[in-house]
Amino acid sequence: MLADAQQKILNSSQWLTADQLYTFAVSTGQNLCTTPNEWLSKGMIFSISNEETELFPLYALNPNAGYVLAKELVNIIEVFRERKDGWGMAYWFGSANGFLGGRRPQDLLQTDPEAVLAAAKDEVMGITHG
C-alpha cells in the first residue's frame, strides 16, 4: 500500500535528481550561485528518497519566472517543517485538498501560492471546535 502511494506521487509530477534540477535551471538561463542541496539545507525546497536516490519536485520551480524557486515554497516548508518529512510534503502537494476546492497544491503553487500557503496553515491547525 505504501509503495502504491509513493508510486502515485512519483507519477503526479516530474521529479529530478539534484544534478538534473541544477542542469535544468541553468539551461533555462538561471545563473545559480547555490545548488539544490544547498536549497534543501536552507529549507527552500524539499526532497524525497526513492530507491536511494534523492529527488526534487520540478513544480518547485516557477516556469513563468524563469524557473526560479516558487516564491511561497519556503514559507510552506516552514509551516510543515516540524510535522512532515519530504514524503509527507510530497503527499500533501500531490493530493486533492478540500481547502483548495479539491485541487492539488502542486497544481496551484505557481498560480495561487497564497492560497496554497493558507491551505498549509489550515492543514497544521487541524479541526478546530468552536
Language model: regions and residue ranges:
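Non-transmembrane "mature" sequence context
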Residues: 1-130
